[in-house]
Regions:
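Hydrophobic/aromatic-rich structural module bridging two neighboring secondary-structure elements via a short loop
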Residues: 1-30
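Ferredoxin-type iron-sulfur electron-transfer modules in oxidoreductases and energy-metabolism complexes
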Residues: 27-30, 38-191
Length: 191
């Protein structure tokens, strides 16, 4: 169910599925307020997800959905809300307004749903504190007990964003010519 997520020797784990050794160090997951002992408050993460207004506006009745289409949204629906991904995320650690791995994975689930007429609104809602803020470090992917790959999901959302006219705001004003003709004395072609 995800309610028993903890950190064991600094790595996010589900307590119910982890065999402990005598010297293991157990602590609450990171980036959440501790309520008591190993129990943390996850209400802020729930609030972030609600900001995305993830719902299906299924007014597109003529669209056929294949088994492949169902498969494309199935994995993102398997999250057990353990918050291990938020605990391991270096961006969420410094920016609590960052939507985070789970919210973005869930956004992809709704964006990939062909019957959802609300897809463009969701893509718009993930541009600020969202897809472009992720460092793509894979920390979330490594700790997910369900085998979900938030990093790949975020990369897919970045591609979908570009296809819909958005761009990475952190590279928009970057001057790629500032390196000069020879990359500051280094020639990548070896000439």
């Amino acid at each position: 169910c995800g309610s028993c997520a903890v950190r064991v020797n600094g790595i996010e784990k589900l307590a119910c599925k982890t065999n402990l050794n005598e010297n293991d160090f157990i602590e609450p997951i990171n980036n959440s307020n501790i309520l008591k002992d190993l129990v943390v408050d996850v209400s802020h993460e729930t609030l972030l997800i609600s900001k995305l207004n993830l719902s299906i506006d299924a007014n597109i009745e003529s669209i056929q959905v294949s088994q492949e289409d169902v498969k494309n949204i199935d994995l993102q629906s398997n999250c057990i809300l353990c918050n291990s991904c938020y605990s391991s995320c270096p961006v969420y650690e410094v920016n609590k307004e960052f939507l985070g791995p789970f919210a973005l994975t869930r956004a992809l689930r709704y964006v990939n749903d062909k019957k959802n007429a609300n897809r463009l609104n969701i893509i718009d809602s993930i541009q600020t504190n969202g897809v472009w803020d992720c460092t793509l470090c894979s920390a979330c992917t490594l700790v997910c007990p369900q085998g979900i790959d938030p990093k790949a999901d975020i990369m897919q959302l970045q591609n979908i964003s570009v296809q819909n006219g958005y761009s990475n705001p952190y590279t928009q004003n970057f001057d790629f010519n500032s390196f000069g003709d020879d990359f500051g004395g280094f020639n990548p072609n070896g000439f």
